[in-house]
A protein has these predicted regions:
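Soluble FAD-dependent oxygen oxidases
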Residues: 1-323
Length: 323
């Protein structure tokens, strides 16, 4: 997405069946309100029968970077790990501007081994498209230097890989088959550069969203914005929350919940997700929004969080095509 734009920005045209049975075409020139709604406004406007999507040429170089962090000595709070994660989060906008994107994960505590022999840790797979390994290493160097102060407290392991086309990269790094069937309650927040200026504010948010020491709580970094995503802000038929156009990444905070959990247990988890974890993310980045696909359906500010300034326009479109 950093190089080619978000999925919604790839749609050139759609054929849609409306609630009254009519089939219409929408694109940059006709039925533009419906086109805008389909490109970022969530579901529910009609049934998409077909769509025309942009195609992009193959690439001849992708450089991938893998990083693992884990406490050398496990403690109840694993504070050193969270300190390092906070430093890393502050540096991600610069790293993204230098061409990096990808996904990161961290756990304060995990019920199984996560990194090495540790049940607490951070791991990421980042990459640069169209950048040589030497160029990527140069861009990564400031981050590695910042993490070096944790070398006496954390296990730090990193590696690099290069690929000569997109599909070999995808099959090795991204097209993986993760196990399905787990359940989790999620909240998310788009993170812009302004929200990361103060280390203490970042660290306070990380402390809360990482969960208590006795909780199984996961956090995911989606370093998928910047680059073309920012450039596509000029597209006047985009329906995405405009916060995407100024946020370099998203943070997703998730609480695992058993399929057999009682209603009371689920209610407690929902409350914690919305009013503890979600509130901490909003406090960190009050001027952005959420990633709708992995957002909190109980968010009391869902209009602003999910849609931003486009809420009224999308509501008008919904009432027009599917009242």
């Amino acid at each position: 997405t950093r190089n080619s734009g978000l999925g919604a920005d790839q749609i050139l045209e759609a054929e849609v069946m409306l609630a009254d049975g009519r089939v219409v075409t929408c694109n940059h020139c006709e039925n533009t309100d419906l086109f805008r709604a389909l490109r970022g406004g969530g579901p529910g406007y009609g049934i998409t029968l077909s769509s025309t999507i942009k195609a992009h040429p193959n690439i001849d170089v992708v450089t991938a970077h893998h990083l693992q962090l884990a406490p050398l000595e496990k403690t109840e709070n694993n504070s050193d790990l969270l300190d390092a994660v906070s430093v890393l989060l502050q540096l991600l906008p610069d790293l993204n501007d230098a061409g990096f994107s990808g996904y990161g994960f961290w756990f304060r505590n995990f019920p199984a081994v996560f990194v090495g022999n540790a049940t607490s840790g951070y791991s990421h797979g980042f990459w640069t498209i169209g950048t040589s390994k030497d160029e990527a290493k140069k861009a990564w160097a400031p981050v590695r230097k910042a993490l070096s102060k944790f070398e006496d407290k954390l296990f730090i392991n990193e590696s690099w890989a290069s690929y000569t086309d997109y599909w070999s990269f995808y099959n090795a790094e991204s097209g993986l088959h993760d196990p399905a069937g787990d359940t989790a309650i999620l909240t998310s927040r788009l993170i812009n550069r302004e929200s990361l200026k103060d280390y203490t504010r970042v660290r306070d948010a990380v402390e809360v969203i990482s969960g208590k020491p006795n909780e199984f709580h996961s956090n995911v970094i989606l370093l998928v914005s910047g680059g073309q995503v920012f450039k596509d802000a000029k597209d006047n038929t985009s329906g995405l929350n405009p916060a995407w156009r100024k946020s370099h990444y998203a943070l997703i905070s998730g609480t695992g919940i058993s399929k057999t959990a009682s209603l009371a247990e689920r209610n407690r988890a929902n409350y914690d997700t919305t009013f503890v974890k979600g509130a901490a993310l909003k406090k960190l980045a009050p001027e952005t929004g959420t990633y709708m696909n992995e957002g909190d359906r109980h968010d009391p500010d869902f209009k602003a969080s999910f849609y931003g300034e486009f809420y009224d326009a999308h509501l008008k479109t919904k009432r027009k095509y599917d009242p």
